[in-house]
């Protein structure tokens, strides 16, 4: 038990007064997700909760005990991807913590994690019409079933719109709606101390996946870029992301992310040239061959989001038939 205590101390760190970052493992990936614990006497509030794996749930419970919290009072989820929402049903609902989620995330939960068959078929059709070979489309559409195994759902107590104030521990945080990575993605902003809890919206090293797919909004890239500019305009003193370490300079990071996506738009326009292409062709040309099918799916989603942004800007045209979607220079 002493060794377990040492391990939790290594994974748990106070990143601001009364704010503790807990780094949790992500099953299936060689990575970590940061969740944030806000202790308040014998209770605590949580921002995100990791996947519903034994290792993650045990780590959260040990962190709560280490901080003297006997129960979770509020669980706020930045978005319903499994590494952020997975353990929601373990810590919230049915007399446990109150669960807060943006209202645009709520209708995505049931088809993604509970009754999967319709979404699996919808994703398969989406992959096929965008040029994915049938064998790959079958594998990729069925991969959703594996993710559902690390998610325990819960009904929200509060559906958020943005601009609400939520007390987390001793802090009062404002909800910032930042769609793009997910339709109802939110950040939490501590106006008093200039702390931005950024979820997956602004990461210090990685560019979050901005994808066009059956559960996305119609134009996720433009929404994402607008949200980046809004968060930079808040001028936070410290950004606390869901992946990677806290960092102080949001302005230069946002500039880098915006420039990255603008370069990618130009690259895709060059790839299309004068030849009509599928989203799958564009993704393979842009990112090259990859053995990992899941990475290929993310590449397709990201490529399609950029193609859609180019279409909105009037720089490409989109041709849709019952069996295919093709893109060409406008």
Question: What kind of region is each of these model predictions?
Answer:
Residues 9-67, 71, 97, 188-199, ...:
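Conserved beta-strand hairpin/beta-sheet module of binuclear metal-dependent hydrolase folds
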Residues 78-84, 102, 181, 185, ...:
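Histidine-centered divalent metal-coordination motifs
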Residues 52-56, 61-167:
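Active-site HxH/HxHxD metal-binding segment of metal-dependent hydrolases
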Residues 44-53, 142-158, 165, 172-265:
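Metallo-beta-lactamase
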Residues 10-11, 34-36, 158, 163-164, ...:
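Residue-level detector of beta-strand structural context in well-folded domains
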Residues 93, 178, 311:
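Short, contiguous alpha-helical
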Residues 1-3, 266-330:
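C-terminal regulatory/interaction regions
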Residues 32-34, 111-114, 209-210, 252-253:
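Short aromatic-enriched loop/helix-cap "lid" or pocket-rim segments at secondary-structure transitions
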């Amino acid at each position: 038990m002493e060794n377990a205590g040492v391990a939790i101390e290594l994974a748990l760190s106070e990143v601001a007064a009364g704010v503790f970052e807990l780094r949790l493992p992500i099953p299936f990936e060689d990575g970590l997700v940061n969740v944030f614990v806000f202790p308040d006497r014998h209770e605590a509030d949580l921002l995100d909760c990791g996947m519903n794996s034994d290792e993650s749930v045990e780590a959260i419970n040990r962190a709560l005990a280490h901080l003297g919290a006997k129960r979770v009072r509020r669980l706020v989820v930045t978005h319903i991807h499994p590494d952020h929402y997975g353990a929601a049903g373990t810590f919230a609902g049915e007399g446990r913590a109150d669960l807060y989620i943006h209202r645009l995330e709520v209708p995505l939960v049931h088809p993604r994690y509970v009754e999967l068959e319709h979404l699996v078929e919808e994703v398969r059709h989406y992959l096929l019409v965008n040029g994915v070979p049938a064998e790959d489309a079958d594998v990729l559409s069925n991969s959703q079933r594996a993710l559902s195994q690390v998610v325990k759902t819960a009904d929200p107590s509060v559906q958020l719109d943005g601009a609400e104030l939520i007390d987390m521990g001793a802090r009062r945080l404002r909800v910032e709606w930042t769609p793009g990575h997910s339709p109802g993605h939110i950040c939490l902003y501590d106006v008093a101390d200039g702390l931005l809890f950024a979820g997956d919206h602004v990461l210090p090293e990685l560019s979050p996946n901005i994808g066009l797919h059956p559960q996305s909004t119609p134009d996720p890239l433009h929404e994402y870029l607008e949200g980046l500019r809004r968060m930079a305009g808040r001028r936070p003193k410290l950004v606390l992301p869901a992946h990677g370490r806290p960092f102080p300079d949001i302005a230069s990071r946002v500039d880098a992310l915006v420039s990255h996506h603008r370069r990618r738009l130009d690259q895709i326009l060059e790839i299309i040239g004068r030849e009509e292409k599928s989203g799958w062709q564009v993704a393979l040309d842009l990112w090259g061959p990859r053995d990992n099918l899941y990475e290929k799916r993310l590449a397709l989603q990201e490529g399609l989001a950029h193609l859609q942004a180019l279409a909105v800007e009037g720089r490409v045209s989109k041709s849709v038939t019952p069996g295919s979607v093709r893109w060409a220079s406008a």
